[in-house]
Each structure stands twice: as C-alpha cells, then as structure tokens.
Regions:
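Glycine-rich loop at the start of a catalytic domain that most often binds anionic cofactors/ligands
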Residues: 5-19, 93-97
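Glycine-rich phosphate- or other oxyanion-binding loops that anchor nucleotides, phosphorylated ligands
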Residues: 20-166
Length: 166
C-alpha cells in the first residue's frame, strides 16, 4: 500500500516480473506504483509481493482488478495480506495510525464474484461471518504495536474512488 515501498528492502528477492510480462495482467497508471511482481523470502518464508496495484477507478473491470489475486491463488498462496492508505471517519484515528480490518462494507458498484463461478477459486458465496482471520489480526496487532504504531481495529468501507477509502 501507499508508503510501504521500503518493505522491498526486507525481501530476499529471487526474481521479479514486470506486469507487462504477465499475460492479461493489468498495468497500474498510478504514480509511484512500479508494476512488478516480486518473488522471494521474508524471514525464510516464501512471499509474492505486488509492487503496485490496479484500481477500479482507473477504468479496469472488477475481474481485471482481482486477476492478480486469482493468479497468486493458482501459484499456491494460502495467506493474503493487503495494505493501503485510506481516509477515515473515526475522530480517534490520527494520520499515520494503523487500522487492522475486522470487517468491511462493500459500496463498490460491481462485485468480483459476478459472472461465471470458478470452483477452484472458491464458492460462489464465500462465508462472510468471519471474513478476517482472528489469529492473523492478533499477530498483526502485536507486531504493529511492537514497532511503536498506534493500532486500531475497524470496519473498512470500500468506494470506487478516485479518493481514499474510509
């Protein structure tokens, strides 16, 4: 997400692919998004890192926006961590605080689950009773606090943009 480009220096990079090298991969038009898929290790754990993402407001379809996640699923990822910069409506939050999602509200006009269901990617209607893993939330909370960040949990509202989500 915005502001986390320095994380790349923590990766033991084995190889990178430019998005242009990957068939059907969208290319980000947002300044500062370098457009690379990085394969490597962080603390001996294999990772795939997107250096730049695509936004619905750039004119891509929802299927194009989620295509990279689907590719990574086929490559064998079992855990997906996402980050971004967003606005907020909670007056207790300050610029630079970290918010870990415990739920979300989708106000986008389209849904990536529309269209033909691909069974290998999951069910037509995923269980949304607990959309975010509580163990991962707790671990992320502890790590962020240990690094000195003000940490909150909250509900993310996704909007089409172009503006920061809340």
């Amino acid at each position: 997400g915005t502001g986390l480009g320095g994380l790349v220096s923590e990766i033991d990079i084995k190889f990178t692919l430019s998005y242009e090298q990957i068939p059907h991969f969208p290319v980000s038009t947002v300044e500062g998004h370098s457009g690379k898929l990085i394969f490597g290790y962080i603390s001996q754990r294999p990772v795939i890192v997107m250096q730049g993402r695509f936004h619905y407001y750039e004119g891509y379809t929802m299927q194009q926006v989620v295509f990279p996640v689907r590719v990574m699923k086929y490559l064998g990822i079992s855990t997906l961590l996402l980050s971004n910069a967003s606005g907020g409506v909670n007056p207790a939050f300050e610029i630079g605080d970290v918010m870990i999602l415990n739920d979300h509200i989708n106000l986008l006009p389209n849904n990536p689950l529309m269209g033909k269901n691909i069974k290998e990617l999951g069910p037509r209607f995923p269980d949304m009773s607990e959309p975010y893993d509580k163990k991962i939330i707790a671990k992320a909370h502890g790590i962020a606090q240990g690094l000195g960040y003000n940490v909150h949990e909250g509900v993310y509202v996704s909007v089409s943009g172009p503006c920061f989500e809340t």
